[in-house]
Amino acid sequence: MLIVAMMAFGMTMSAAELTVVSTEKIVLSEEAHHPTLSPNGDVVLFTQPNYKGLKSLNLATNEVKVIDEGVGAGFEPIFSTDGKEVSFKTEIIVDGLSQRDVKCYNLENGNKAQLIKPTRNNIDTRALVNKTYAKPNADKQSISISIDGVVTEVNPIKDGYRYIWSEVSPSKGKMFFNEIYTGLYVSELDGSKAQYLAARADFPCWAGDKYVIALKTKDDGYVITSAKVIAINIETKEIVELTDDETLVAGLTATADKIVYTTENGEMYLMNIKITE
């Protein structure tokens, strides 16, 4: 049984044109980690700290479903563009070697099918499921951009060394990317006009076309001591903290009107937001 406790506080960031309408703590009978929201924000996927198993939570009905119990099933699952299906990888050991397959689960009827049989080849589920995406290449020294199936390779920063966390905006007008040594940037899809946004911005994701939601972390050289959800306005470059020091956030996901984040100890929160453009 799922219980939702709401804490509405009407917190407004006028300069960033983003309003936090309410925050809801979603209390589950188990821990929740590594959340992923569906495109329309009605379903959130979650897993265990080690990515074993994958479950879905319907935010309207509070229903939790088991999608898969396999090893690695919770690592970067991908929704279809209509939000009706989820594709994910599971890991098995064959003759002492690790192999991964790709499965597809239908959220409406519960049907599950294997798309790719176990293989040792590297499989990118983003490229398999969607025709529009941005992803760092295997060597992390460039980014592949696919717009409606047309793929180009870009290197947005002349002295960039390693790229991580790249994603095309919802309207397909821009992309963000993180250069591991310097931080988060936003640019045109061809990599031009790269603009610096933040030094520490982990797990970034789009909230509409004007904001990037990310995790700002601090550490003492050994462990994370602070991890806050931040909202970054890509036009003004203003950064607003959305959570406090008492909440050690470990994972997040967002849409244009919702942010879901999980804490280090497995608590899940739903933050309803309003963006005025």
What role is predicted for each listed range?
Residues A15-E277:
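Sequence signature of WD/YWTD-type beta-propeller architectures
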Residues M1-G10:
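Bacterial N-terminal signal peptides
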